[in-house]
Amino acid sequence: RGTDDLPLARLCRSIPVVRIGETDSELPSADVICDNEGGIAALVDHLVDVHGVTEMSFIGELTTYDMHRRFEAFQSRAAERGIAMGRPLLDDSVASSKEWLVNLCEAIDAEQLPRALVCGNDQTALAVIDLLRDAGVRVPQDVIVTGFDGILASASAPVTLTTVRQPLGAMGRLAAKLLDEQRGVPWDEPGVHRMPVKLVLGNSCGCV
């Protein structure tokens, strides 16, 4: 978005700009992102190969670069594995209206929950688990829930999350290193730095 006085495109041509968690091939910036595709593929493969899941849905708000990439990666990997994809429980509203919550409640009431819910991030996954518990749906016995990001709460919640941990510390250090190396000189062209992720198993899939 840039600053209040300078649009991002002009800002990138005035000073070196590093963006974390998003990328744009049109802007001369250094973009540090995580391997969303690899992380989602690892989650889907784990659910299929270890837990025998044959139906799953993606749930979350499609309001960021990461969430869009994760949803697209989910659709692609699930199709490759021949998985039946339930109705996506999504919210693509920029107003963050939590439409996915309404969709999830409707699925619970209609008894149309899939075997697994792949959530776009950990915050969503933790909220989903709370909602399912209040509705009498057991995790992971009735529904498996997974997250993404590896935030601290994912490991300390009553039901620990199976999630994908992105290396936020390493991403921040790389961003600082890239800026330091530029010494105030803006980049001439876009650059993307993709960081590896790690599958972390928890109670929410039944592995721990």
Predicted regions located by residue number:
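Hydrophobic alpha-helical segments within soluble ligand-binding/sensing domains
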Residues: A30-F58, S97-E106, A125, Q166-G184
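Flexible loop/turn connectors
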Residues: C105-V208
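Short hydrophobic segments within beta-strands
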Residues: I20, F58-E61, V118-C119, T146
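C-terminal regulatory
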Residues: A79-V118
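Glycosyltransferases and closely related glycan-assembly transferases
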Residues: P7-I15, Q75-S76, V128-V137
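Flexible loop/hinge segments that line or gate small-molecule binding clefts
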Residues: R1-G38, Q123, D149-L161
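An alpha-beta-alpha
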Residues: A41-I83, R87, G191-C205
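Hydrophobic residues at beta-strand termini and immediately following loops
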Residues: I20, V32, I59, L89-D91, ...
